[in-house]
From Swiss-Prot:
First-level EC class: transferase
GO MF annotation list: adenylate kinase activity; ATP binding
Record's comment describing the protein's domains: Consists of three domains, a large central CORE domain and two small peripheral domains, NMPbind and LID, which undergo movements during catalysis. The LID domain closes over the site of phosphoryl transfer upon ATP binding. Assembling and dissambling the active center during each catalytic cycle provides an effective means to prevent ATP hydrolysis.
Assembly notes: Monomer.
Source organism superkingdom: Bacteria
Key words of the record: ATP-binding, Cytoplasm, Kinase, Nucleotide biosynthesis, Nucleotide-binding, Transferase
Protein name: Adenylate kinase
Pathway stated in the Swiss-Prot or TrEMBL entry: Purine metabolism; AMP biosynthesis via salvage pathway; AMP from ADP: step 1/1
Cellular compartments annotated: Cytoplasm
SUPFAM superfamilies in alphabetical order: P-loop containing nucleoside triphosphate hydrolases
The species this protein was found in: Alcanivorax borkumensis (strain ATCC 700651 / DSM 11573 / NCIMB 13689 / SK2)
Lineage summary: Bacteria, Pseudomonadati, Pseudomonadota, Gammaproteobacteria, Oceanospirillales
Function: Catalyzes the reversible transfer of the terminal phosphate group between ATP and AMP. Plays an important role in cellular energy homeostasis and in adenine nucleotide metabolism.
Stretches for region Disordered: 139-160
Catalysed reaction, written as an equation: AMP + ATP = 2 ADP
Amino acid sequence: MRVILLGAPGAGKGTQAQFIKEQFNIPQISTGDMLRAAVKAGTPLGLEAKKVMDAGGLVSDDIILGLVKERITENDCANGFLFDGFPRTIPQAQSLVEQGVDIDFVVEIDVDDEEIIERLSGRRVHPASGRVYHTKYNPPKVEGKDDETGDELVQRDDDQEETVRKRLEVYQAQTRPLVDFYQDLATQGESNAPRYVRVAGVGSVDDIRDRVLSALKG
């Protein structure tokens, strides 16, 4: 089972990725983890990537794709893999196709922008303990205060509405085109084309999990 998981920030990809990993016994592969592992191991690609990162540059698609191809040959990928945060761009997606890296399913967790803004901008955190609340879905007993200590709760900068809107704009501009790319690929009917599945990312976590797993088994 080789899966790409797409969805806007706040759509719940991280939670669903855990369920997919456990259900199909496949590793979750993120480019960040891959880069760190390759740099630590001192592989040729890792050293190349380190040189770029130390200079403050962005690691090229060629290096990323090389790391991906190396990573998916490892033993834990025998049953497949789940790509997390990759591909991010059309050139990366095209390179995967050209390099013969077949994907079985592309799953999009679909959530309306306004719902995401409400989810993220409503989060409040107790910094000392890491406890997370939500003004609507999981409010503290006393507004703005941690249940256990009575300390003030804070809103992380990342969760402020303006920041969330900017992150969604970046997603729509950069990653959203991937949805169209994979939809087109799926409709071309090639034998190795992935199946494209859109899953509604609203409702309880268990409801969404059931929809995702049912789509992957379908």
